[in-house]
C-alpha cells in the first residue's frame, strides 16, 4: 500500500479517532497528575503528549533524555508538564523523582508503567536464542528492570493514591505472554525472535496486576494491564531493518503509538470502583469501543525503505471483510498468519532460514 494510496486517508482517520478519544475523556482526566515511565520517546512520549492535550498534568520519567531534549524543553515550558530523570531500578532515584513530583503537583493520581527492557536491547536484534541458551545474568537483568523496577515504581507512586483513596495504575505488558492460548502459534510463526526472558517478565507483571488490584481495591486504587500489540516503539525501526537484511519481514506493519491513547485515557479515569484487575488487548478494546480495528491504526508514513518491506508483505497477504470494509487481518491470529506466510514465502522453508543464520 503506497502513501498516496492510503497514507493520507489513514492519517486523517487516525487523527479523527484521537480527537474523539480526547473529547470523550478530557473531562475525566483534566487536572489529574499522571506519571509515565519511559516517557522520553516512543510509546511513552506519545502517551505524554496525548495526556497533556487532554488537560492532565503529566510527568515524563525516563532514564535517559539524550535524544529527546526537544521534548524535555517542551515539557518544561508547559505549566502542566514535567520531565524527571528516573532509573526505575535505583531506589534513591525513585525517591527523588517521587518527591519532586509531589513538590511540584502535590499528589499523584495515575502511574503508567511503560518503561521496560526489551529483547532487542538485551540481545542482538536478529538471531535465535532458545530459553536454555540464555544465562542467569540475562534473566537477572531483564527481571531487574521489568519486574522489580515496575514494583519499585508502584511502591513509591501508590502512596499518594492510597492517601487520597483514589488512583489508577496501568501496567504495559505483552500479548506474547498469552502464546499458549494460540496453541504455541506465537512461537511457531516467530522462531527467529528472542522471546525469553522478556515474556516471562511480562507474565510476572500480569500476575502482579491481578493480585495487587484486589489488595488495594479497598484503598480506591485501580490496577490494570494493557497489551499494546504490534506497535512502532522506539526500537522498532532498527530491528525491522536488521531483519530485512536477512530477507525477513519483521512481523507486520506496526500500529502508531497513538493507538494506546483511547484506552489509556479510559484507564486514567478509573479508580477501584470502576475497571480494576483486568487485562486488555488494545486492538480489540479499540474495535469494541468504536475506535477502529488494527488496520485503522497502522503506520502508513514509515521511511521509504520500511514502506518497501511492509508493502511487499502486504502484497502476499489476503484481505478480508469486516463490517463491509476490506482490511488486512487485524487480530493476533491474523497477524501471526500473515507474518508467518510472508516469511515462509521469502525463505522457502524454516530449514533454509536456519541455515542462513
Curated annotation (Swiss-Prot):
For this protein, the record's InterPro entries field holds:
NAD(P)-bd_dom_sf (IPR036291), SDR_fam (IPR002347)
Q: Which GO terms describe its molecular function?
A: fluoren-9-ol dehydrogenase activity; NAD binding
Question: Alphabetically, which GO biological process terms does the record hold?
Answer: fluorene catabolic process
Keyword NAD annotated: yes
Entry superkingdom: Bacteria
Q: Which residues bind NADP(+)?
A: 36-67, 87, 202
Q: Which reaction does it catalyse?
A: 9H-fluoren-9-ol + NADP(+) = 9H-fluoren-9-one + NADPH + H(+); 9H-fluoren-9-ol + NAD(+) = 9H-fluoren-9-one + NADH + H(+)
The pathway noted for it is: Aromatic compound metabolism
Asked whether the UniProt record includes NAD among its keywords, one would answer yes
Q: List the CDD domains hit by this protein, alphabetically.
A: SDR_c
In terms of Gene3D superfamilies, this protein maps to: NAD(P)-binding Rossmann-like Domain
Catalytic residues, chain numbering: 198
Q: What is its EC number?
A: 1.1.1.256
What keywords would UniProt list here?
NAD, Oxidoreductase, Plasmid
User: What does this chain do?
Assistant: Catalyzes the dehydrogenation of both 9-fluorenol and 1,1a-dihydroxy-1-hydro-9-fluorenone to produce 9-fluorenone and 2'-carboxy-2,3- dihydroxybiphenyl, respectively.
Q: Which family does it belong to?
A: Belongs to the short-chain dehydrogenases/reductases (SDR) family.
Name the UniProt record assigns to this protein: Fluoren-9-ol dehydrogenase
Which species does this protein come from?
Terrabacter sp. (strain DBF63)
Amino acid at each position: 500500500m503506497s502513501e498516496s494510496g492510503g497514507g493520507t486517508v489513514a492519517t486523517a482517520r487516525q487523527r479523527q479517532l484521537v480527537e474523539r478519544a480526547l473529547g470523550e475523556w478530557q473531562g475525566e482526566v483534566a487536572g489529574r497528575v499522571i506519571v509515565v515511565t519511559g516517557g522520553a520517546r516512543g510509546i511513552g512520549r506519545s502517551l505524554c503528549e496525548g495526556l497533556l492535550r487532554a488537560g492532565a498534568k503529566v510527568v515524563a520519567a525516563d532514564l535517559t533524555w539524550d535524544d529527546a531534549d526537544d521534548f524535555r524543553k517542551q515539557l518544561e515550558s508547559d505549566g502542566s508538564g514535567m520531565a524527571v530523570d528516573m532509573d526505575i531500578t535505583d531506589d534513591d532515584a525513585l525517591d527523588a523523582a517521587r518527591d519532586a513530583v509531589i513538590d511540584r503537583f502535590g499528589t499523584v493520581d495515575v502511574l503508567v508503567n511503560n518503561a521496560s527492557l526489551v529483547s532487542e536491547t538485551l540481545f542482538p536484534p536478529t538471531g535465535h536464542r532458545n530459553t536454555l541458551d540464555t544465562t542467569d545474568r540475562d534473566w537477572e537483568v531483564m527481571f531487574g528492570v521489568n519486574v522489580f523496577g515496575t514494583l519499585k515504581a508502584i511502591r513509591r507512586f501508590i502512596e499518594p493514591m492510597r492517601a487520597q483513596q483514589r488512583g489508577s495504575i496501568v501496567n504495559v505488558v505483552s500479548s506474547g505472554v498469552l502464546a499458549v492460548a494460540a496453541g504455541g502459534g506465537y512461537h511457531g510463526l516467530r522462531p527467529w525472535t528472542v522471546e525469553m526472558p522478556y515474556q516471562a517478565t511480562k507474565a510476572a507483571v500480569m500476575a502482579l496486576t491481578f493480585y495487587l488490584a484486589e489488595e488495594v481495591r479497598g484503598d480506591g486504587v485501580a490496577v490494570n494491564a494493557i497489551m499494546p500489540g504490534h506497535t512502532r516503539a522506539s526500537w522498532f525501526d532498527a530491528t525491522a531493518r536488521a531483519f530485512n537484511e536477512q530477507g525477513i519481514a519483521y512481523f507486520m506493519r506496526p500500529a502508531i503509538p497513538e493507538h494506546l491513547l483511547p484506552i489509556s485515557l479510559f484507564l486514567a479515569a478509573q479508580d477501584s470502583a470502576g475497571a480494576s484487575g483486568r487485562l486488555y488487548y488494545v486492538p480489540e478494546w479499540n474495535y469494541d469501543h468504536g475506535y477502529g480495528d488494527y488496520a485503522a491504526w497502522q503506520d502508513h508514513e514509515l521511511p521509504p525503505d520500511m514502506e518497501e518491506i511492509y508493502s511487499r508483505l502486504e502484497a502476499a497477504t489476503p484481505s478480508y471483510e469486516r463490517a463491509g470494509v476490506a482490511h488486512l487481518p487485524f487480530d493476533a491470529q491474523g497477524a501471526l498468519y500473515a507474518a508467518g506466510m510472508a516469511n515462509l514465502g521469502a525463505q522457502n522453508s524454516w530449514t533454509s532460514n536456519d541455515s542462513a543464520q
